[in-house]
């Protein structure tokens, strides 16, 4: 995949979610939730501050993150793979 996000943008591949309930029932449609976790595939250079300096991002390629899938999250298909493009501010945590 050849993509370079700009500024404070991050490219994330959503993690797969278990499609069975704890009782073994296969979940489909709206019952099968989409994960809000994923792996960071690419990061931008950083956020440009008012004084013109660039503040580097706190996440790096390979981090597993929990994100808020809100208004600013863009879904794209790149090389047949669905990815999410979001701002670092849409990330809520890094799983360590």
Curated annotation (Swiss-Prot):
InterPro entries per UniProt: Chaperonin_GroES (IPR020818), Chaperonin_GroES_sf (IPR037124), Chaprnonin_Cpn10_CS (IPR018369), GroES-like_sf (IPR011032)
Primary location class: cytoplasm
GO BP terms, alphabetized: chaperone cofactor-dependent protein refolding
Chaperone is among the record's keywords: yes
One Pfam family it belongs to: Cpn10
Gene Ontology MF terms: ATP binding; metal ion binding; protein folding chaperone; protein-folding chaperone binding; unfolded protein binding
GO cellular component terms, A-Z: cytoplasm
PROSITE patterns for this protein: CHAPERONINS_CPN10
Localization: Cytoplasm
Keyword set, alphabetical order: Chaperone, Cytoplasm
HAMAP family in UniProt: CH10
Protein family according to the UniProt entry: Belongs to the GroES chaperonin family.
Purpose of the protein: Together with the chaperonin GroEL, plays an essential role in assisting protein folding. The GroEL-GroES system forms a nano-cage that allows encapsulation of the non-native substrate proteins and provides a physical environment optimized to promote and accelerate protein folding. GroES binds to the apical surface of the GroEL ring, thereby capping the opening of the GroEL channel.
Complexes and interactors: Heptamer of 7 subunits arranged in a ring. Interacts with the chaperonin GroEL.
The protein, known as: Co-chaperonin GroES
Organism: Shewanella loihica (strain ATCC BAA-1088 / PV-4)
Encoding gene, per UniProt annotation: groES
